Amino acid sequence: MPVHSREKKESNHEEMEVDFAEQEGSSSEDEDTESSSVSEDGESSEMDDEDCERRRMECIDEMTNLEKQFTDLKDQLYKERLNQVDAKLQEVMSGKAAEYLEPLATLQENMQIRTKVAGIYRELCLESVKNKYDCETQAAFQHWESEKLLLFDTVQTELEEKIRRLEEDRHSIDITSELWNDELQSRKNKKKDPFSPDKKKKPVVVSGPYIVYMLQDLDILEDWTAIRKAMATLGPHRVKTDASSKIDKLQHNARSEDGRLFYDGEWYSRGQAITIDKKDEYPTSAVITTINHDEVWFKRVDGSKSKLYVSQLQKGKYTVKHA
């Protein structure tokens, strides 16, 4: 709108210049009659000034009108843009805007994919934990079984040793039991005759070297029993008994040397397949995994691991052979 007002002013100036040129032309033509028309020229100049002033006021009014229209249009455009922004904001807040729905759909798709992956990972973790639990349970049960067998063998060995010692004590005490019974019988006789006069013992005449016992009869019996036990322990009878018991217990020749097992004339090493046989049970196939000083670890076909003690092989509780 300022451009239009400038063009308007230029057109007014051109018109004024044209009028001024015409006036100069007319004045040149009437130079000869200049003196006679002085009054007429004064009146025409006054009319030109009034016309210029009037045109100037019209231009100013037109410029003011154009500026007002421009301001109104600018306000109207601002309000329309503001209404558009408010409408778009309302669509976003209500969840209907395209700029909001497209990224939202992408986020929902990503969420579904990640949720599915997390579910699969959860199932795999649960399966892994379950397998680990089953493995630990099976290992604990097998360890309990092996420890139970070992404890049973240990207790049985201790009880057999105690029984053997009691039998030896019984055989060694039989000799002194007669003296013990005689002592008790003599005490009973003394209690039966409390009013009998005390008989004086005659001094015993001993020839040669002799030992004077200053102990009581019970102390002598205890010492005699201890001597008999020591003699039975160190005597040939005890040696024969120990040898026979060891021969009875060690029915098989079994030992471990340098990471290998020697059993009944055959050598067994790690990684060899063997067959384990126990009384009243079916034979089991296994593979040797570790051979220690006093135990042998093996792995069954089902993957479970167990161990055998060399003492169990020596006693014949288990037998092994090459598969």
Curated annotation (Swiss-Prot):
Quote the biased-composition stretches of kind Basic and acidic residues, using this chain's numbering: 1-15
User: Does the keyword Methyltransferase belong to this entry?
Assistant: no
Gene Ontology terms: biological process: negative regulation of transcription by RNA polymerase II
Listed SMART domains: Sds3
Where do the coiled-coil regions begin and end? 50-81, 156-178
List the molecular function annotations (GO) for this entry.
histone deacetylase binding
The annotated regions of Acidic residues compositional bias extend over 16-51
Q: Where are the transmembrane segments?
A: none
Pfam families attached to this UniProt entry: Sds3
Q: What residue spans carry the region label Disordered? A: 1-52
This protein's UniProt keywords: Coiled coil, Nucleus, Repressor, Transcription, Transcription regulation
GO cellular-component terms in the record?
A: Sin3-type complex
What is stated as this protein's family in its record?
A: Belongs to the BRMS1 family.
Q: What is this protein called?
A: Breast cancer metastasis-suppressor 1-like protein-A
* Source species of the chain: Danio rerio
Instruction: Give me the gene this protein comes from.
Output: brms1la
